UniProtKB/Swiss-Prot annotation:
Subunit structure: Part of the 50S ribosomal subunit.
Alphabetized HAMAP family for the sequence: Ribosomal_uL30_B (MF_01371_B)
Matches recorded under SUPFAM superfamilies: Ribosomal protein L30p/L7e
Database matches in Gene3D superfamilies: Ribosomal protein L30, ferredoxin-like fold domain
Record CDD domains: Ribosomal_L30
Database matches in InterPro entries: Ribo_uL30_ferredoxin-like_sf (IPR036919), Ribosomal_uL30_bac-type (IPR005996), Ribosomal_uL30_CS (IPR018038), Ribosomal_uL30_ferredoxin-like (IPR016082)
Cellular component annotations (GO), alphabetically ordered: cytosolic large ribosomal subunit
Domain of life: Bacteria
Keyword terms of this UniProt record: Ribonucleoprotein, Ribosomal protein
Protein name: Large ribosomal subunit protein uL30
Provenance organism: Thermotoga neapolitana (strain ATCC 49049 / DSM 4359 / NBRC 107923 / NS-E)
A Pfam family of this chain: Ribosomal_L30
Family: Belongs to the universal ribosomal protein uL30 family.
UniProt GO BP: translation
Amino acid sequence: MPKKLKIKLVKSPIGYPWDQKDTVKRLGLRRMNQVVIKDDCPQIRGMIRKVRHLVEVEEVEEGGNEA
């Protein structure tokens, strides 16, 4: 099964450069502790790498019961 990434915003992007704020928004994260599930692809991995100090990432199996 393809992998998915569970991404959680754990630190506010306030005070960080605009490009990092924009990356957080493009990942679909709007609020603290919000979780989104994204496909594991190079583009998403690159976005995560850019804001790795603001998010927590966990790999999950597609179709799993994790929320």
